[in-house]
Amino acid sequence: MATSLQAPILGSRPPRRTLRFLSFALFSALVLVVASFSSRKSESGSGLRSGSVEPEYAWTNQMLTWQRAGFHFRTVKNYMNDPSGPMYYKGWYHLFYQHNPNYAYWGDISWGHAVSRDLLNWFHLPVAVKPDRWYDIYGVWTGSITVMPDDGRVVMLYTGGTKEKYQIMSVAMAADPSDPLLVEWVKYDEVNPVLRPPPGIGLTDFRDPNPIWYNTTDSTWQLVIGSKNDSLQHTGIAMVYTTKDFINLTLLPGVLHSVDHVGMWECVDLFPVASSGPLIGRGLDRSMMLADNVKHVLKASMNDEWHDYYAIGSYDVATHRWVPDDESVDVGIGMRIDWGKFYASRTFYDPVKERRVMWGYVGETDSGDADVAKGWASFQGIPRTVLFDVKTGTNVLTWPIEEVESLRMTRKDFSDIVVNKGSTVELHVGDANQLDIEAEFEMDKDALETAIEADIGYNCSSSGGAVSRGVLGPFGLFVLANQDLTELTATYFYVSRATDGSLHTHLCHDEMRSSKANDIVKRVVGGTFTVLDGELLSLRILVDHSIVESFAQGGRTSATSRVYPTEAIYERARVFLFNNATGATITAKAVKVWQMNSTSNQYYPFTSSN
Protein backbone atom coordinates (compact mmCIF):
# COMPACT_ATOMS: atom_id res chain seq x y z
CA MET A 1 0.00 0.00 0.00
CA ALA A 2 1.26 3.48 -0.85
CA THR A 3 2.43 5.89 1.79
CA SER A 4 -0.47 8.13 2.69
CA LEU A 5 -0.60 11.88 2.88
CA GLN A 6 -3.46 13.11 5.03
CA ALA A 7 -4.59 16.72 5.01
CA PRO A 8 -7.81 18.59 5.74
CA ILE A 9 -10.09 19.47 2.85
CA LEU A 10 -11.25 23.06 2.59
CA GLY A 11 -14.93 23.93 2.50
CA SER A 12 -17.71 23.24 4.95
CA ARG A 13 -21.33 24.02 5.65
CA PRO A 14 -23.50 23.92 8.77
CA PRO A 15 -25.34 20.70 9.62
CA ARG A 16 -28.98 20.42 8.70
CA ARG A 17 -32.04 19.11 10.46
CA THR A 18 -32.51 15.44 9.77
CA LEU A 19 -34.93 12.62 9.18
CA ARG A 20 -34.93 9.07 10.40
CA PHE A 21 -33.00 6.47 8.34
CA LEU A 22 -35.20 4.00 6.45
CA SER A 23 -33.51 2.36 3.48
CA PHE A 24 -30.49 2.67 1.19
CA ALA A 25 -30.59 4.22 -2.26
CA LEU A 26 -33.61 4.23 -4.49
CA PHE A 27 -33.39 5.36 -8.10
CA SER A 28 -34.39 8.88 -8.99
CA ALA A 29 -33.47 11.37 -11.66
CA LEU A 30 -32.21 14.88 -11.19
CA VAL A 31 -32.68 17.70 -13.63
CA LEU A 32 -29.53 19.76 -14.00
CA VAL A 33 -29.65 23.43 -14.85
CA VAL A 34 -27.72 23.72 -18.11
CA ALA A 35 -27.35 26.14 -20.95
CA SER A 36 -29.34 25.19 -24.05
CA PHE A 37 -28.57 25.52 -27.73
CA SER A 38 -31.07 26.81 -30.27
CA SER A 39 -29.90 24.23 -32.77
CA ARG A 40 -27.34 21.47 -32.41
CA LYS A 41 -26.67 21.46 -36.13
CA SER A 42 -25.15 24.93 -36.00
CA GLU A 43 -23.16 24.35 -32.81
CA SER A 44 -19.67 25.75 -32.66
CA GLY A 45 -18.17 23.15 -30.35
CA SER A 46 -16.80 25.76 -27.99
CA GLY A 47 -19.06 25.39 -24.97
CA LEU A 48 -21.11 28.08 -23.24
CA ARG A 49 -20.07 30.46 -20.54
CA SER A 50 -22.36 32.36 -18.19
CA GLY A 51 -21.93 35.93 -17.04
CA SER A 52 -19.26 38.23 -18.38
CA VAL A 53 -16.84 37.05 -21.06
CA GLU A 54 -13.59 35.90 -19.49
CA PRO A 55 -10.27 36.72 -21.16
CA GLU A 56 -8.81 33.77 -23.02
CA TYR A 57 -6.18 31.82 -21.15
CA ALA A 58 -2.60 31.95 -22.39
CA TRP A 59 -2.36 28.28 -23.35
CA THR A 60 1.10 26.98 -24.15
CA ASN A 61 1.79 24.43 -26.86
CA GLN A 62 2.78 21.99 -24.13
CA MET A 63 -0.62 22.32 -22.45
CA LEU A 64 -2.56 21.99 -25.70
CA THR A 65 -0.54 18.97 -26.80
CA TRP A 66 -1.26 17.27 -23.48
CA GLN A 67 -5.04 17.56 -24.02
CA ARG A 68 -5.05 15.05 -26.89
CA ALA A 69 -6.41 11.69 -25.77
CA GLY A 70 -4.32 8.56 -26.02
CA PHE A 71 -6.88 5.75 -26.26
CA HIS A 72 -10.21 7.37 -27.18
CA PHE A 73 -11.39 7.67 -30.77
CA ARG A 74 -10.15 10.93 -32.26
CA THR A 75 -9.80 12.48 -35.67
CA VAL A 76 -6.37 12.90 -37.18
CA LYS A 77 -7.20 16.61 -37.32
CA ASN A 78 -10.08 19.10 -37.35
CA TYR A 79 -13.61 18.94 -35.95
CA MET A 80 -15.86 15.98 -35.11
CA ASN A 81 -19.24 15.46 -33.48
CA ASP A 82 -22.10 12.92 -33.85
CA PRO A 83 -21.30 9.25 -34.50
CA SER A 84 -23.23 8.01 -37.53
CA GLY A 85 -23.82 4.62 -39.10
CA PRO A 86 -21.69 2.43 -36.81
CA MET A 87 -21.57 -1.12 -38.09
CA TYR A 88 -19.58 -4.33 -38.50
CA TYR A 89 -18.95 -5.24 -42.12
CA LYS A 90 -16.78 -7.93 -43.70
CA GLY A 91 -14.26 -8.14 -40.87
CA TRP A 92 -14.10 -4.43 -40.04
CA TYR A 93 -15.81 -2.22 -37.51
CA HIS A 94 -16.87 1.00 -39.22
CA LEU A 95 -17.52 4.34 -37.60
CA PHE A 96 -18.80 7.29 -39.58
CA TYR A 97 -18.99 10.63 -37.84
CA GLN A 98 -19.91 14.27 -38.38
CA HIS A 99 -16.70 15.96 -39.47
CA ASN A 100 -15.36 19.25 -40.73
CA PRO A 101 -12.43 18.09 -42.88
CA ASN A 102 -11.06 21.62 -43.23
CA TYR A 103 -11.12 23.30 -39.83
CA ALA A 104 -11.28 22.59 -36.09
CA TYR A 105 -14.77 24.05 -35.69
CA TRP A 106 -18.32 23.29 -36.80
CA GLY A 107 -19.00 23.82 -40.51
CA ASP A 108 -18.69 22.06 -43.89
CA ILE A 109 -20.13 19.03 -42.11
CA SER A 110 -19.28 15.82 -43.94
CA TRP A 111 -19.21 12.15 -43.00
CA GLY A 112 -15.78 11.18 -41.72
CA HIS A 113 -15.03 7.47 -41.90
CA ALA A 114 -12.71 5.12 -40.00
CA VAL A 115 -12.29 1.36 -39.66
CA SER A 116 -10.91 -0.89 -36.95
CA ARG A 117 -10.41 -4.56 -36.18
CA ASP A 118 -10.96 -4.10 -32.44
CA LEU A 119 -12.86 -0.80 -31.84
CA LEU A 120 -9.68 0.66 -30.32
CA ASN A 121 -7.04 1.06 -33.05
CA TRP A 122 -8.33 3.00 -36.04
CA PHE A 123 -7.50 3.66 -39.67
CA HIS A 124 -9.03 6.83 -41.09
CA LEU A 125 -10.37 6.64 -44.63
CA PRO A 126 -11.24 9.39 -47.11
CA VAL A 127 -14.34 11.43 -46.29
CA ALA A 128 -17.34 9.31 -47.28
CA VAL A 129 -19.75 12.07 -48.36
CA LYS A 130 -19.38 15.85 -48.56
CA PRO A 131 -21.88 18.73 -48.73
CA ASP A 132 -21.73 19.26 -52.50
CA ARG A 133 -25.36 19.09 -53.72
CA TRP A 134 -28.20 21.57 -53.39
CA TYR A 135 -29.98 19.16 -51.03
CA ASP A 136 -27.05 18.94 -48.58
CA ILE A 137 -24.99 22.06 -49.30
CA TYR A 138 -25.29 23.28 -45.70
CA GLY A 139 -24.24 19.93 -44.26
CA VAL A 140 -24.33 16.15 -44.56
CA TRP A 141 -25.75 15.49 -41.12
CA THR A 142 -26.51 12.47 -38.99
CA GLY A 143 -28.06 9.31 -40.41
CA SER A 144 -27.66 5.56 -40.65
CA ILE A 145 -26.29 2.78 -42.82
CA THR A 146 -28.18 -0.39 -43.70
CA VAL A 147 -27.09 -3.54 -45.52
CA MET A 148 -30.00 -4.68 -47.68
CA PRO A 149 -30.78 -8.35 -46.99
CA ASP A 150 -31.88 -9.18 -50.54
CA ASP A 151 -29.02 -7.96 -52.73
CA GLY A 152 -26.31 -6.79 -50.30
CA ARG A 153 -26.46 -3.12 -51.26
CA VAL A 154 -25.14 -0.82 -48.53
CA VAL A 155 -27.44 2.19 -48.17
CA MET A 156 -26.69 5.43 -46.36
CA LEU A 157 -29.74 7.50 -45.39
CA TYR A 158 -28.71 10.89 -44.05
CA THR A 159 -30.05 14.29 -43.10
CA GLY A 160 -29.09 17.00 -45.56
CA GLY A 161 -29.18 20.74 -44.95
CA THR A 162 -30.18 23.06 -47.80
CA LYS A 163 -28.91 26.62 -48.14
CA GLU A 164 -32.05 27.69 -46.25
CA LYS A 165 -31.00 25.20 -43.53
CA TYR A 166 -34.09 23.08 -44.21
CA GLN A 167 -33.66 19.42 -43.23
CA ILE A 168 -34.41 16.71 -45.78
CA MET A 169 -33.40 13.07 -46.23
CA SER A 170 -31.17 11.81 -49.01
CA VAL A 171 -29.54 8.55 -50.03
CA ALA A 172 -26.03 7.49 -50.94
CA MET A 173 -24.88 3.95 -51.66
CA ALA A 174 -21.57 2.15 -51.41
CA ALA A 175 -20.09 2.07 -54.90
CA ASP A 176 -18.65 -1.41 -54.32
CA PRO A 177 -20.36 -3.54 -51.64
CA SER A 178 -17.63 -6.16 -52.06
CA ASP A 179 -15.09 -3.69 -50.68
CA PRO A 180 -14.80 -4.39 -46.94
CA LEU A 181 -13.63 -0.81 -46.37
CA LEU A 182 -16.58 0.78 -48.20
CA VAL A 183 -14.33 3.59 -49.35
CA GLU A 184 -16.41 5.06 -52.18
CA TRP A 185 -20.00 6.32 -51.91
CA VAL A 186 -22.34 7.55 -54.63
CA LYS A 187 -25.21 9.98 -54.07
CA TYR A 188 -28.36 9.23 -56.05
CA ASP A 189 -29.18 12.60 -57.58
CA GLU A 190 -32.04 11.16 -59.63
CA VAL A 191 -34.03 10.38 -56.47
CA ASN A 192 -32.63 12.76 -53.84
CA PRO A 193 -34.04 14.11 -51.66
CA VAL A 194 -36.12 11.06 -50.83
CA LEU A 195 -38.00 12.62 -47.92
CA ARG A 196 -39.11 16.04 -46.71
CA PRO A 197 -40.74 17.10 -43.44
CA PRO A 198 -44.42 16.10 -43.36
CA PRO A 199 -47.19 18.68 -42.77
CA GLY A 200 -47.09 20.12 -39.27
CA ILE A 201 -43.36 19.53 -38.81
CA GLY A 202 -40.94 22.45 -38.88
CA LEU A 203 -38.58 22.59 -41.84
CA THR A 204 -35.60 22.65 -39.46
CA ASP A 205 -37.00 20.03 -37.06
CA PHE A 206 -36.66 16.79 -39.02
CA ARG A 207 -33.50 14.73 -38.68
CA ASP A 208 -31.41 11.67 -37.86
CA PRO A 209 -33.13 8.67 -39.55
CA ASN A 210 -32.47 5.32 -37.92
CA PRO A 211 -33.83 1.84 -38.84
CA ILE A 212 -35.35 0.03 -35.87
CA TRP A 213 -36.84 -3.20 -37.27
CA TYR A 214 -36.94 -5.34 -40.40
CA ASN A 215 -40.13 -7.26 -41.10
CA THR A 216 -39.09 -10.46 -42.87
CA THR A 217 -42.73 -11.24 -43.70
CA ASP A 218 -43.13 -8.39 -46.18
CA SER A 219 -39.49 -7.26 -46.51
CA THR A 220 -40.11 -3.79 -45.10
CA TRP A 221 -38.08 -1.68 -42.72
CA GLN A 222 -39.41 0.53 -40.01
CA LEU A 223 -37.27 3.56 -39.22
CA VAL A 224 -37.57 6.50 -36.84
CA ILE A 225 -36.94 10.21 -37.32
CA GLY A 226 -36.79 12.72 -34.48
CA SER A 227 -38.72 15.98 -34.33
CA LYS A 228 -40.83 18.25 -32.13
CA ASN A 229 -44.29 19.80 -32.19
CA ASP A 230 -44.38 23.32 -30.80
CA SER A 231 -48.07 23.70 -31.68
CA LEU A 232 -48.75 21.32 -28.81
CA GLN A 233 -46.65 21.74 -25.66
CA HIS A 234 -43.07 21.89 -26.94
CA THR A 235 -43.47 18.16 -27.45
CA GLY A 236 -40.61 15.89 -28.43
CA ILE A 237 -41.70 13.23 -30.91
CA ALA A 238 -40.40 10.29 -32.91
CA MET A 239 -42.12 9.44 -36.19
CA VAL A 240 -42.11 6.02 -37.86
CA TYR A 241 -41.68 5.44 -41.59
CA THR A 242 -41.76 2.21 -43.57
CA THR A 243 -39.72 1.43 -46.65
CA LYS A 244 -38.49 -1.44 -48.77
CA ASP A 245 -35.62 0.38 -50.46
CA PHE A 246 -34.90 3.58 -48.46
CA ILE A 247 -35.97 5.56 -51.52
CA ASN A 248 -39.73 5.27 -51.25
CA LEU A 249 -40.78 5.94 -47.67
CA THR A 250 -44.25 6.07 -46.11
CA LEU A 251 -45.13 7.88 -42.89
CA LEU A 252 -47.22 5.71 -40.58
CA PRO A 253 -50.15 7.28 -38.70
CA GLY A 254 -49.48 8.80 -35.31
CA VAL A 255 -46.05 8.75 -33.68
CA LEU A 256 -43.80 6.16 -32.09
CA HIS A 257 -43.87 8.15 -28.86
CA SER A 258 -44.06 11.73 -27.63
CA VAL A 259 -43.38 13.60 -24.39
CA ASP A 260 -44.56 17.13 -23.64
CA HIS A 261 -42.33 20.01 -22.51
CA VAL A 262 -39.00 18.42 -23.49
CA GLY A 263 -38.43 19.93 -26.93
CA MET A 264 -36.70 18.57 -29.99
CA TRP A 265 -35.75 14.89 -30.07
CA GLU A 266 -32.75 13.97 -32.17
CA CYS A 267 -30.61 10.88 -32.72
CA VAL A 268 -33.54 8.67 -31.69
CA ASP A 269 -32.70 5.01 -31.14
CA LEU A 270 -34.91 2.02 -30.29
CA PHE A 271 -33.41 -1.38 -29.56
CA PRO A 272 -34.22 -4.65 -27.75
CA VAL A 273 -32.62 -5.86 -24.52
CA ALA A 274 -33.03 -9.28 -22.92
CA SER A 275 -34.90 -8.92 -19.61
CA SER A 276 -34.89 -12.59 -18.57
CA GLY A 277 -34.26 -16.08 -19.86
CA PRO A 278 -31.31 -17.57 -21.77
CA LEU A 279 -30.44 -14.36 -23.64
CA ILE A 280 -29.45 -12.50 -20.47
CA GLY A 281 -25.95 -11.08 -20.79
CA ARG A 282 -26.08 -10.93 -24.59
CA GLY A 283 -26.77 -8.00 -26.82
CA LEU A 284 -29.65 -8.42 -29.24
CA ASP A 285 -29.94 -7.71 -32.93
CA ARG A 286 -33.00 -5.72 -34.00
CA SER A 287 -34.39 -8.92 -35.51
CA MET A 288 -35.07 -9.95 -31.90
CA MET A 289 -37.63 -7.18 -31.38
CA LEU A 290 -40.45 -9.76 -31.22
CA ALA A 291 -38.60 -12.35 -29.11
CA ASP A 292 -39.86 -13.50 -25.72
CA ASN A 293 -38.45 -11.95 -22.54
CA VAL A 294 -37.41 -8.77 -24.32
CA LYS A 295 -37.80 -5.13 -23.32
CA HIS A 296 -37.38 -2.19 -25.67
CA VAL A 297 -35.16 0.79 -24.87
CA LEU A 298 -36.15 4.12 -26.40
CA LYS A 299 -33.37 6.72 -26.36
CA ALA A 300 -33.43 10.31 -27.57
CA SER A 301 -31.01 13.21 -27.45
CA MET A 302 -32.63 16.37 -26.06
CA ASN A 303 -31.63 19.33 -28.23
CA ASP A 304 -32.92 21.83 -25.64
CA GLU A 305 -30.41 20.76 -23.00
CA TRP A 306 -27.89 18.54 -24.77
CA HIS A 307 -28.33 15.35 -22.79
CA ASP A 308 -29.23 11.79 -23.82
CA TYR A 309 -32.24 10.26 -22.08
CA TYR A 310 -33.73 6.79 -22.24
CA ALA A 311 -36.62 4.78 -20.89
CA ILE A 312 -37.52 1.11 -20.84
CA GLY A 313 -40.82 -0.08 -22.23
CA SER A 314 -42.52 -2.17 -24.90
CA TYR A 315 -42.74 -1.69 -28.66
CA ASP A 316 -45.73 -2.96 -30.63
CA VAL A 317 -44.54 -3.45 -34.21
CA ALA A 318 -48.11 -3.83 -35.43
CA THR A 319 -49.24 -0.44 -34.14
CA HIS A 320 -45.69 1.08 -34.27
CA ARG A 321 -46.19 2.46 -30.78
CA TRP A 322 -43.81 2.34 -27.84
CA VAL A 323 -45.12 2.54 -24.26
CA PRO A 324 -42.90 3.17 -21.21
CA ASP A 325 -43.01 0.80 -18.26
CA ASP A 326 -43.08 3.81 -15.93
CA GLU A 327 -44.35 7.18 -17.19
CA SER A 328 -42.67 9.00 -14.30
CA VAL A 329 -39.27 8.25 -15.88
CA ASP A 330 -40.29 8.73 -19.51
CA VAL A 331 -37.85 9.85 -22.19
CA GLY A 332 -36.60 13.34 -21.45
CA ILE A 333 -37.76 13.47 -17.84
CA GLY A 334 -36.19 10.39 -16.30
CA MET A 335 -33.01 8.40 -16.80
CA ARG A 336 -29.89 9.70 -18.49
CA ILE A 337 -27.42 7.68 -20.53
CA ASP A 338 -24.70 9.86 -19.01
CA TRP A 339 -24.83 12.87 -16.68
CA GLY A 340 -21.97 14.75 -18.28
CA LYS A 341 -20.57 15.73 -21.66
CA PHE A 342 -21.86 12.79 -23.72
CA TYR A 343 -24.30 13.31 -26.59
CA ALA A 344 -25.89 12.07 -29.83
CA SER A 345 -25.36 8.43 -28.89
CA ARG A 346 -26.07 5.67 -31.37
CA THR A 347 -25.96 1.89 -30.95
CA PHE A 348 -25.21 -1.00 -33.28
CA TYR A 349 -25.20 -4.77 -32.96
CA ASP A 350 -21.82 -6.50 -33.04
CA PRO A 351 -22.40 -10.01 -34.43
CA VAL A 352 -18.86 -11.13 -33.61
CA LYS A 353 -19.27 -10.81 -29.84
CA GLU A 354 -23.08 -10.80 -29.71
CA ARG A 355 -23.32 -7.44 -28.02
CA ARG A 356 -24.96 -4.06 -28.47
CA VAL A 357 -22.39 -1.28 -28.56
CA MET A 358 -23.07 2.41 -27.97
CA TRP A 359 -21.09 5.36 -29.28
CA GLY A 360 -21.52 8.97 -28.12
CA TYR A 361 -19.48 12.06 -28.77
CA VAL A 362 -17.71 14.15 -26.16
CA GLY A 363 -17.37 17.76 -27.26
CA GLU A 364 -15.09 20.55 -26.20
CA THR A 365 -15.88 23.08 -23.48
CA ASP A 366 -12.91 25.36 -24.09
CA SER A 367 -12.70 28.37 -26.41
CA GLY A 368 -12.93 28.12 -30.17
CA ASP A 369 -9.55 29.81 -30.48
CA ALA A 370 -7.98 27.09 -28.34
CA ASP A 371 -9.45 24.42 -30.63
CA VAL A 372 -8.02 26.17 -33.68
CA ALA A 373 -4.64 26.33 -31.97
CA LYS A 374 -4.82 22.58 -31.22
CA GLY A 375 -5.94 21.77 -34.74
CA TRP A 376 -8.68 19.40 -33.61
CA ALA A 377 -11.89 19.32 -31.57
CA SER A 378 -13.90 16.59 -29.79
CA PHE A 379 -13.56 12.89 -29.05
CA GLN A 380 -15.87 9.92 -29.14
CA GLY A 381 -16.52 8.38 -25.75
CA ILE A 382 -15.22 4.89 -25.10
CA PRO A 383 -17.61 2.47 -26.85
CA ARG A 384 -19.92 0.88 -24.30
CA THR A 385 -21.87 -2.33 -24.16
CA VAL A 386 -25.55 -1.96 -23.27
CA LEU A 387 -27.48 -4.55 -21.24
CA PHE A 388 -30.65 -4.65 -19.18
CA ASP A 389 -29.95 -4.55 -15.44
CA VAL A 390 -31.66 -7.72 -14.28
CA LYS A 391 -30.86 -6.97 -10.63
CA THR A 392 -32.87 -3.76 -10.49
CA GLY A 393 -35.24 -4.36 -13.40
CA THR A 394 -35.46 -0.60 -13.95
CA ASN A 395 -32.41 0.54 -15.91
CA VAL A 396 -29.74 -0.43 -18.40
CA LEU A 397 -26.04 -0.93 -17.76
CA THR A 398 -23.52 0.84 -19.98
CA TRP A 399 -19.95 -0.36 -19.58
CA PRO A 400 -16.66 0.03 -21.48
CA ILE A 401 -16.18 -2.72 -24.05
CA GLU A 402 -13.95 -5.54 -22.85
CA GLU A 403 -11.22 -4.64 -25.35
CA VAL A 404 -10.34 -1.62 -23.22
CA GLU A 405 -8.79 -3.99 -20.69
CA SER A 406 -6.22 -5.05 -23.30
CA LEU A 407 -4.68 -1.58 -22.96
CA ARG A 408 -3.87 -2.05 -19.29
CA MET A 409 -0.17 -2.03 -18.45
CA THR A 410 1.44 -1.48 -15.03
CA ARG A 411 -0.95 -2.13 -12.16
CA LYS A 412 -0.93 -0.81 -8.60
CA ASP A 413 -3.13 -2.36 -5.89
CA PHE A 414 -4.33 -0.71 -2.69
CA SER A 415 -6.56 -2.32 -0.08
CA ASP A 416 -8.40 -1.43 3.11
CA ILE A 417 -7.35 2.21 3.10
CA VAL A 418 -9.18 4.12 5.82
CA VAL A 419 -10.01 7.66 4.73
CA ASN A 420 -10.94 9.67 7.79
CA LYS A 421 -13.41 12.52 7.82
CA GLY A 422 -12.01 15.58 6.08
CA SER A 423 -8.85 13.91 4.77
CA THR A 424 -7.09 12.83 1.60
CA VAL A 425 -4.82 9.90 0.81
CA GLU A 426 -2.47 10.06 -2.14
CA LEU A 427 -2.23 6.95 -4.30
CA HIS A 428 1.27 6.74 -5.71
CA VAL A 429 0.55 5.32 -9.15
CA GLY A 430 3.30 6.81 -11.31
CA ASP A 431 2.21 8.35 -14.60
CA ALA A 432 -1.39 9.46 -13.99
CA ASN A 433 -2.37 10.85 -17.40
CA GLN A 434 -3.85 7.64 -18.84
CA LEU A 435 -5.47 5.40 -16.24
CA ASP A 436 -8.10 2.75 -15.70
CA ILE A 437 -9.19 2.82 -12.04
CA GLU A 438 -11.48 0.37 -10.26
CA ALA A 439 -12.46 1.15 -6.68
CA GLU A 440 -14.83 -0.23 -4.05
CA PHE A 441 -15.88 1.78 -1.02
CA GLU A 442 -17.51 0.89 2.27
CA MET A 443 -19.08 3.46 4.56
CA ASP A 444 -19.01 3.19 8.34
CA LYS A 445 -22.21 1.26 9.10
CA ASP A 446 -22.69 3.01 12.41
CA ALA A 447 -22.72 6.32 10.56
CA LEU A 448 -25.37 5.03 8.16
CA GLU A 449 -27.55 3.81 10.98
CA THR A 450 -27.20 6.79 13.29
CA ALA A 451 -26.92 9.72 10.89
CA ILE A 452 -30.01 11.88 11.11
CA GLU A 453 -29.07 14.78 8.86
CA ALA A 454 -31.38 15.39 5.92
CA ASP A 455 -30.17 16.64 2.54
CA ILE A 456 -33.65 17.28 1.21
CA GLY A 457 -33.51 18.16 -2.47
CA TYR A 458 -29.78 17.52 -2.81
CA ASN A 459 -28.46 17.32 -6.34
CA CYS A 460 -24.93 17.36 -7.65
CA SER A 461 -25.27 20.40 -9.88
CA SER A 462 -26.39 22.81 -7.15
CA SER A 463 -24.47 21.27 -4.25
CA GLY A 464 -21.26 23.24 -4.36
CA GLY A 465 -19.35 20.18 -5.49
CA ALA A 466 -16.68 18.19 -3.69
CA VAL A 467 -15.94 20.97 -1.19
CA SER A 468 -19.52 20.91 0.15
CA ARG A 469 -19.57 18.85 3.32
CA GLY A 470 -22.44 16.64 4.41
CA VAL A 471 -22.74 13.93 7.02
CA LEU A 472 -22.42 11.10 4.47
CA GLY A 473 -20.37 12.65 1.70
CA PRO A 474 -18.82 13.54 -0.62
CA PHE A 475 -16.10 10.87 -0.94
CA GLY A 476 -14.26 9.32 -3.85
CA LEU A 477 -11.23 10.22 -5.94
CA PHE A 478 -9.38 13.25 -7.20
CA VAL A 479 -7.80 12.60 -10.60
CA LEU A 480 -5.63 14.92 -12.69
CA ALA A 481 -4.73 16.64 -9.42
CA ASN A 482 -1.65 18.68 -8.64
CA GLN A 483 0.27 18.11 -5.42
CA ASP A 484 -1.32 20.91 -3.40
CA LEU A 485 -4.86 20.11 -4.64
CA THR A 486 -5.44 23.52 -6.14
CA GLU A 487 -6.22 21.90 -9.49
CA LEU A 488 -8.14 18.62 -9.66
CA THR A 489 -11.14 16.79 -11.10
CA ALA A 490 -13.32 15.10 -8.48
CA THR A 491 -15.42 12.02 -9.17
CA TYR A 492 -17.30 10.95 -6.09
CA PHE A 493 -20.30 9.59 -4.23
CA TYR A 494 -22.66 11.56 -2.04
CA VAL A 495 -25.30 9.89 0.13
CA SER A 496 -28.27 12.11 0.91
CA ARG A 497 -31.54 11.72 2.75
CA ALA A 498 -34.89 12.31 1.10
CA THR A 499 -38.05 13.68 2.66
CA ASP A 500 -39.29 10.18 3.45
CA GLY A 501 -36.10 9.39 5.36
CA SER A 502 -34.63 7.09 2.73
CA LEU A 503 -31.03 7.40 1.61
CA HIS A 504 -30.17 8.17 -2.00
CA THR A 505 -26.74 7.67 -3.54
CA HIS A 506 -25.37 10.12 -6.11
CA LEU A 507 -22.50 9.87 -8.58
CA CYS A 508 -21.05 13.34 -9.21
CA HIS A 509 -18.31 14.95 -11.30
CA ASP A 510 -16.94 18.25 -10.04
CA GLU A 511 -15.05 20.21 -12.72
CA MET A 512 -14.94 23.50 -10.81
CA ARG A 513 -11.26 23.13 -9.83
CA SER A 514 -10.25 21.12 -12.89
CA SER A 515 -8.35 24.02 -14.43
CA LYS A 516 -6.96 27.42 -13.49
CA ALA A 517 -8.08 28.73 -16.87
CA ASN A 518 -11.19 30.92 -16.86
CA ASP A 519 -12.33 30.67 -20.49
CA ILE A 520 -13.73 27.14 -20.22
CA VAL A 521 -16.99 25.66 -18.97
CA LYS A 522 -16.75 24.15 -15.49
CA ARG A 523 -19.73 22.40 -13.93
CA VAL A 524 -20.79 19.96 -11.27
CA VAL A 525 -22.88 17.18 -12.83
CA GLY A 526 -24.36 13.90 -11.68
CA GLY A 527 -27.41 11.97 -10.58
CA THR A 528 -28.73 9.18 -8.41
CA PHE A 529 -28.57 5.44 -8.95
CA THR A 530 -29.66 2.27 -7.21
CA VAL A 531 -27.50 0.48 -4.66
CA LEU A 532 -28.91 -2.86 -3.54
CA ASP A 533 -28.60 -4.40 -0.09
CA GLY A 534 -25.18 -5.94 0.46
CA GLU A 535 -23.47 -4.10 -2.39
CA LEU A 536 -20.32 -2.09 -1.88
CA LEU A 537 -20.18 1.21 -3.72
CA SER A 538 -18.16 0.58 -6.87
CA LEU A 539 -16.60 3.02 -9.29
CA ARG A 540 -14.61 2.71 -12.49
CA ILE A 541 -12.82 5.76 -13.90
CA LEU A 542 -11.13 6.08 -17.28
CA VAL A 543 -8.67 8.97 -17.33
CA ASP A 544 -7.35 9.85 -20.77
CA HIS A 545 -5.76 13.28 -20.61
CA SER A 546 -8.59 15.81 -21.05
CA ILE A 547 -11.43 13.28 -20.92
CA VAL A 548 -12.61 11.58 -17.72
CA GLU A 549 -15.36 8.93 -17.79
CA SER A 550 -16.82 7.39 -14.63
CA PHE A 551 -19.12 4.38 -14.26
CA ALA A 552 -20.85 3.56 -10.98
CA GLN A 553 -22.19 0.24 -9.77
CA GLY A 554 -21.33 -1.76 -12.85
CA GLY A 555 -22.69 0.85 -15.24
CA ARG A 556 -26.01 1.77 -13.62
CA THR A 557 -25.03 5.38 -14.16
CA SER A 558 -22.12 7.29 -15.66
CA ALA A 559 -20.66 10.76 -16.01
CA THR A 560 -18.22 12.19 -18.54
CA SER A 561 -16.15 15.37 -18.30
CA ARG A 562 -13.81 17.35 -20.53
CA VAL A 563 -11.19 19.07 -18.39
CA TYR A 564 -8.26 21.32 -19.23
CA PRO A 565 -5.72 21.40 -16.38
CA THR A 566 -2.86 23.85 -16.58
CA GLU A 567 -0.64 22.34 -13.86
CA ALA A 568 -1.82 18.76 -13.21
CA ILE A 569 -0.40 17.46 -16.49
CA TYR A 570 2.44 15.19 -17.53
CA GLU A 571 4.54 14.14 -14.52
CA ARG A 572 2.68 16.56 -12.23
CA ALA A 573 -0.64 14.69 -12.43
CA ARG A 574 -1.63 12.88 -9.22
CA VAL A 575 -4.43 10.66 -7.85
CA PHE A 576 -5.94 10.97 -4.37
CA LEU A 577 -8.67 9.32 -2.35
CA PHE A 578 -10.71 11.85 -0.40
CA ASN A 579 -13.48 11.92 2.18
CA ASN A 580 -15.19 15.22 2.86
CA ALA A 581 -18.02 13.73 4.94
CA THR A 582 -18.50 15.18 8.41
CA GLY A 583 -20.07 12.09 9.96
CA ALA A 584 -18.63 8.98 8.33
CA THR A 585 -15.29 7.27 7.90
CA ILE A 586 -14.81 5.66 4.48
CA THR A 587 -12.80 2.54 3.72
CA ALA A 588 -11.49 1.98 0.22
CA LYS A 589 -11.76 -1.80 0.33
CA ALA A 590 -9.94 -2.30 -2.96
CA VAL A 591 -8.46 0.11 -5.47
CA LYS A 592 -6.79 -1.10 -8.65
CA VAL A 593 -5.04 1.40 -10.90
CA TRP A 594 -3.66 0.53 -14.32
CA GLN A 595 -1.59 2.78 -16.51
CA MET A 596 -3.07 2.61 -20.00
CA ASN A 597 -1.39 2.16 -23.34
CA SER A 598 -2.23 4.40 -26.28
CA THR A 599 -4.05 3.24 -29.40
CA SER A 600 -3.11 3.85 -33.01
CA ASN A 601 -4.89 6.55 -34.95
CA GLN A 602 -3.67 7.00 -38.52
CA TYR A 603 -4.64 7.17 -42.16
CA TYR A 604 -5.23 3.84 -43.87
CA PRO A 605 -2.11 2.61 -45.74
CA PHE A 606 -3.68 1.96 -49.13
CA THR A 607 -0.40 0.59 -50.46
CA SER A 608 -0.99 -2.47 -48.25
CA SER A 609 -3.60 -5.16 -48.74
CA ASN A 610 -6.93 -4.76 -47.01
Curated annotation (Swiss-Prot):
Carbohydrate-modified residues: N215, N229, N248, N459, N580, N597
Post-translational modification summary for this protein: Might be processed in two N-terminal and C-terminal proteolytic fragments.
GO CC, one annotated term: vacuolar membrane
Official protein name in the record: 6(G)-fructosyltransferase
Keyword Hydrolase (UniProt): yes
Cytoplasmic topological domain residue ranges: 1-20
Described purpose of this protein according to its UniProt entry: Involved in the synthesis of fructan of the inulin neoseries. Has no 1-FFT activity.
Organism (species): Asparagus officinalis (Garden asparagus)
TM segment ranges: 21-38
Keywords assigned by UniProt, alphabetized: Disulfide bond, Glycoprotein, Glycosidase, Hydrolase, Membrane, Signal-anchor, Transferase, Transmembrane, Transmembrane helix, Vacuole
Main subcellular location of this protein, as a coarse class: membrane
Localization annotation: Vacuole membrane
